[in-house]
Structures are given as C-alpha cells and as structure tokens.
Amino acid sequence: MALCGFAAPILAVLLSGIHPVRADDPSYVAAVYEHRVVLNPDPREPVERSAALEHMNKNLDVFEEQTALAAKQGAQIIVFPEDAIHGFNYTRSSIASYLETVPDPGRVTWSPCADPDRFQNTEVLHRLSCMARKNHIFLVANMPDRQVCDRLVDPLCPLDGQYQFNTDVVFSDNGTIVARYHKQNLYFEAAFDAPPKHEYVTFTTPFAGRFGVFTCFDILFREPVVTLVKDMGIRQLVYPTAWMNQLPLLAAVQFQCSFSYSAGVTLLAANVRAAALGMTGSGIFTPWDALHHHDAVGETGKLLVKRLPVLDPSVLEDGAGKAWLLVPFSGHPKVEVAVEESEKEEPWPVSSFSPMQSGPEPGYCPKEDCTEEPIPFTSTMMYDNFTLVALQGREGNLTVCDGSFCCHLLFRRRRTAKRELYALGAFDGLHVVHGTYYLEVCALVRCTGLEKESCGGETEHAQTLVDFHMHGTFSTEHVYAGVLGSGMTLDRPDRSGWGSKGRFYMTRTGMTTGLVTAVLYGRVYEEDSM
C-alpha cells in the first residue's frame, strides 16, 4: 500500500500511441481485475477456520466469475489484487485461521485441483487452482501464507516458530502452482513477516515467455523489481497491489504508468477497490500504451482485458523482433523516431515559441513573484519539504535547486482558462514518512489554490495547457518520468532521456487536457539506509 486517498471521477481509458510491434509479431491476451473486497468487519478478532473460509469464499466467488469472463474474452493470464481474498488490518494472531501453507514450487510439483488431498487446510489454493484449470488460464492471486521454521536452525525464525508472509501465488493453465513470492517491502502489515532474504521470482508461460512477480510497496524499492528487470532481463511483470492513492506524485495508475514507461516493461497491475481507503487504479501497461481504470466514486469491480506484444527477449527472434526492446531507465520517444545524437537535448529557446492563444490571464503568479526572477519558496509535498518557484507569464525558463540538486523548466502556456497557479519544485533528501527511501524529484505541479502554501496539495483537475521541457541533475539512473492530465488522464512524454552532464530530461507538447503534474521521480536506492 501507499499513502492516502483522494476522489476523482470514473476513468477507464486506453492510452495509446503508434505501436512499434508488427502485426505478425508474437502477442498474447492479459487481464487484470480491480476487486471490491468483501471485508472482515472486525479483523483484529480471531475467528474459527470455518468462519475464515466462509469469508474468503465470498471473494473467491467473484474471482471465479471474473476468471470465466476473462477467459471468454481470450485472456491467457489474469491478475487479482493484493489482500483481495482476505482483506486488511489483521494482527499476527487474528489472521491465523486465514493462513495456508503454499509449498515451494521449486521443490514440489502440485496441482491442488488435481490432487486436493495431498496437503491439508488448502481450500483456498484448491479453489484458485480449479479456476485456472477449468478456464485454461494462468492465474495470479495474493493470499496469507504460513511457513514453519526452526529457531535452532534459523536465527531469524519468529518466536512462534513460523513465518507469516504476504504471498503471491501463480497457477499455470492446468492448475499447477508454478511460482510463489513473499512480499519484501511491507507497509504497516502487523500480521506478516518480511522474508529473511530477497526473493527473485519468475515463471514461464508458453504464450509470452517469462514474467516476474512483485507486490504493491515493492515498486518503490530496488529489491526485488529493479534486479528482476536490470539484472535478470525480465520485461513482463505481474503486480498485485492494494495501493492508497496520493497526489500529486503517487496515484496508483500515475506511478504504474511511469514505472512501465521508464523501466521499459509490461506491467499487469491489479488494485483493490475501496472508496473509504482511497484505493483504486489498475491497468495493463506497456512502454507505449495502457488500458487503465480509475474510479474513486463507485464501488464496483472492473475487469480489463488487452492484447499485448511479447517483450521477453529470450523468446523473441534476433533482428527486428528485438530492435525496439528498450534499455531500462534509458529514456525513449513515445513513438519510433530517428533522432540524431546532437538533437537528443534540444535547447528549445523561449523565442521559438509559437504565439499563444488569447485568454483572460497571462498566467497567474503570486503578486510578490511577478518579477523577472521568481523568488524561491518552500512548501510541503508528499510529506517532504520542497523548494519551489512559481511560473509567471505565458512562457519562461526557470531553475530551482535543493542544495546541489537542480531542476530546470522551459514552458509555454497554450491556454489558461482560469487563474491557476503552477510551480516547479525540487527535492533531494530522505523521505521518512510511511516508509524510508531517498529521493531526487523534479515536479511541475498545479497548486490547489492561488497561495504558494497550496503548492504540493492534492488536486485532480486543471484547465491550463502547458508545453514543457524539464530536466534535472540526477545522481541516479533510476528516474521515473510521468505526466498526469486533468481528471486522472494518463499522458506520456514525447521523449525523455539522458543529455549532457548527467541531466535527465523529458519533453511534452500538445496536451489536450489541463496539466496536473509532470514529474521526474528519481530513486537513489543506495542512499535508503543513510
């Protein structure tokens, strides 16, 4: 999970550019389901196994229905959300009746549907296995898992003699368990233990090759996902999550899209639907396009199904089939465009801007900042103390620094329908609220009001159309580029990449919705423990 909630209208959108894959290239059909979880009304109170099964079967009934619907639409793999079978907020003792032991598929080959009596107390595994087997589909689900340990052998073994894990389980299309992943980066999950060592879990399908597995809060950390992508060459990922949205930088679909685009991967992201907790936002993302769903008003689930290109390098033929595979975190154009080396970071001078559309205002700025050089100020964004400068006028060239880390922005407003304040912010430091991780962030944000103190607050809507070129002096190669439009409209940079002197940049022109956020979100993983 991450952070806190907000409200926005229903959004189920296909975001697409020109796809670089030929029609005769290998493809497959994937599905994700955003599930409204039937919750335990008192998760801190222990229950009998029969009551736990009765509760979980209510959610599994929905899984069974949605798996059949996905299969009818040709889906070969389906992903369900984190916590979607059992719910949230258990204690270590109150979750006991919900636990099952998921065997290691590297040691045990087992289809719970075909051999239901091999292991006891595995009713949930049996139902999931039969869903996969009946519908001839790979199925990814998340469930609580118990693994017995011996404190005489394992010094990290908990006092009660068992690990309790937040676990993703993958079933093949014949119901066999083919992968098991224990979530590494827990988010206020008192019922669960982190695994004693990092797990790098993959599984192989006959239709698309290899997939990697990770869960929710893992997406903000190096292990395991960056290792899966950069060191192991995984380009397709399944991602159960129970993510609480927080703007302006970490709404679920916003960061899912940024991660897929910047890491150069396919991401199958299934989130929980829970309005009271601000949970929504699922999607099927590739580096070039996305089918996603965001609904902060209704309470119904949502099935997404999409045909995708195979991105596993190990199953693609040499030559044209691999030519468009992306190097993770290298940046790339949205469509295939020939670019000379000298043009990769074009100066784009203000004097070259085309005439602006007429409008009621030349672009709002605080009265004290309507000068040639805007005055830096500080404001809290995502619990961090950002240094910002306000945008003024219709076009300009700004720089803002937090210590030696600097962000630069060249902008022009094509339309300003009403008074809206924008600011460019920089942050270089250790984030310590709801997790500890080191950030270098450049963010162009629409402020929630007309006062500087409102810059960094949560808003989903904007009317101002902004063309921009942004770059920052990052010390890390792990920079996630993202653009978010009004009404939770996902956008993407026209191009992004590394310029001279360690500067990472992105450019976007011609947006048709107002700009809410444009962000270069740098993660300095090696500084997390400072």
Regions found by a protein language model. Give the residues of each.
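Conserved beta-strand scaffold positions in the cores of enzyme catalytic domains, especially
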Residues: 30-32, 267-269, 282
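Active-site-proximal beta-strand elements of phosphoester/diester hydrolases
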Residues: 27-52, 180-183, 202, 209-218, ...
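N-terminal signal peptide
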Residues: 10-28
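Bacterial N-terminal signal peptides that target proteins for export
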Residues: 1-7
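C-terminal beta-strand edge segments of enzyme domains
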Residues: 271-530
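Active-site catalytic loop in hydrolytic enzyme cores
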Residues: 117-119, 125-137, 143-236, 240-257, ...
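Cys-nucleophile CN-hydrolase/nitrilase-fold catalytic domain and related Cys-dependent amidase chemistry
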Residues: 52-174, 243-266, 272-275, 428-431, ...
